[in-house]
């Protein structure tokens, strides 16, 4: 008898099996994109000096915790490329898809991504220490460093500031600078409704109080997880120095009283 090799034919996949494979592949691709975004965010922290190599694993695990994830697979390459806004968008979208981020609106996305950025932030005491060490060298070096930190931390959102509209116009009183600030997000209807239903809180007492440092925020109060203040002493009283997150003008800074008292402008 003549010998033949019998090669079994591949059975055709059912529609459901085919769809399951597609879904599985998409899930793997989606997970890989999230891992790349996490790696990209850690890389961003390293590149900006927010963290050091010794902090990288800790920062990654903190990000995983905020994302509601309990595992991580190291992706190939340097991580997700692009600016900070693009990296955060991937993480925010995934958090909403998995139900970790309940509402997909600018108010709630801002509350959430501020938690992510805090994973890269030094403690307030470390910021204060580094500021005054630089101040001994040069006050300008100290304030330049602090301003950069305020931007790198995404407390000042560079990608929104550049959208602000600015121009000058001549008036009978002189040249007038006009700014339309687009970096301060408007509340969406859901956030407004949630703020009305929420229990009224008197903490922090205002958006400038010292107690804002590290505050997670809520629908009617911005997140300040990534906010750091430099304590200063003026006339034997405690004050705070910070930059404005909305930058109404170049290096817009604020000095405020350490106590919550009515503002009085006099001589």
Where are these regions (language model features)?
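Short, positively charged and aromatic/hydrophobic N-terminal segments
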Residues: 3-24
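Active-site microenvironments that recognize anionic phosphate/pyrophosphate groups
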Residues: 29-263
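Long, well-ordered alpha-helical scaffolding segments within enzyme catalytic domains
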Residues: 265-267
């Amino acid at each position: 008898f003549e010998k033949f090799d019998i090669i079994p034919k591949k059975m055709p996949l059912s529609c459901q099996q085919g769809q399951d494979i597609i879904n599985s592949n998409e899930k793997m691709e989606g997970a890989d994109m999230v891992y790349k975004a996490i790696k990209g965010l850690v890389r961003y922290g390293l590149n900006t000096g927010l963290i050091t190599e010794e902090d990288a694993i800790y920062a990654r695990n903190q990000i995983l915790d905020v994302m509601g994830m309990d595992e991580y697979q190291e992706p190939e390459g340097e991580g997700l490329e692009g600016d900070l806004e693009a990296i955060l968008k991937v993480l925010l979208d995934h958090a909403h898809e998995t139900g970790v981020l309940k509402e997909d609106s600018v108010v709630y996305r801002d509350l959430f991504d501020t938690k992510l950025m805090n994973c890269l932030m030094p403690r307030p005491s470390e910021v204060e220490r580094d500021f005054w060490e630089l101040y001994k060298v040069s006050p300008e070096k100290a304030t330049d460093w602090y301003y950069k930190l305020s931007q790198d931390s995404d407390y000042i959102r560079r990608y929104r500031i550049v959208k602000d509209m600015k121009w000058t116009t001549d008036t009978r009183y002189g040249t007038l600078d006009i700014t339309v600030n687009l970096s301060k997000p408007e509340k969406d209807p859901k956030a407004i409704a949630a703020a009305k239903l929420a229990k009224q809180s008197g903490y922090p007492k205002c958006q400038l109080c010292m107690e804002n440092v590290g505050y997670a925020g809520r629908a009617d109060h911005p997140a300040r997880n990534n906010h750091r203040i430099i304590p200063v002493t003026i006339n034997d009283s405690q004050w705070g120095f910070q930059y404005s997150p909305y930058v109404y003008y170049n290096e817009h800074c604020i000095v405020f009283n350490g106590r919550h008292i009515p503002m009085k402008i006099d001589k």
